[in-house]
Amino acid sequence: MLMGEFTHTIDSKGRLIIPAKFREQLGAHFIVTRGLDGCLFGYPLNEWAILEQKLKALPLTKRDARAFVRFLYSAATDCEIDKQGRINIPITLRTHASLEKKCVIVGVSNRLEIWSAERWNKFTSETADNFDEIAEDLNIDF
């Protein structure tokens, strides 16, 4: 399970350090693609395979399904972790997530998310203000 929050800097070549805690669970390489809310999603290969089966089951006749699958797959890339613990994030993905300098890498159960620090701070601030209401709406019993 991926969990926790880490801040690292992305360099001008698009290289970002993946926290050691996550590297152990992700393996030597994993899939990174566009995520929701303006971040990137990173999936271990076994989790990507599960998602891929769900995407294949979507009806090709539905316009939204085709658009979603295209958008997700067109930017998906197999990222290999180098000897320094870094991955190279392509410009398309950096642009999608507005990654320029300071990044936040977040573990979210079966995936990691990569956020620009600015977007992450905005998201956490807004969510903190409504956390109780969100839990109630989702009927989560702690």
Curated annotation (Swiss-Prot):
Domain SpoVT-AbrB: 5-47, 76-119
Any matching Pfam family: MraZ
GO molecular function terms noted in the UniProt entry: DNA-binding transcription factor activity; transcription cis-regulatory region binding
GO biological process, one term: negative regulation of DNA-templated transcription initiation
Keyword NAD in annotation: no
Family that this chain belongs to: Belongs to the MraZ family.
Identification of the protein by name: Transcriptional regulator MraZ
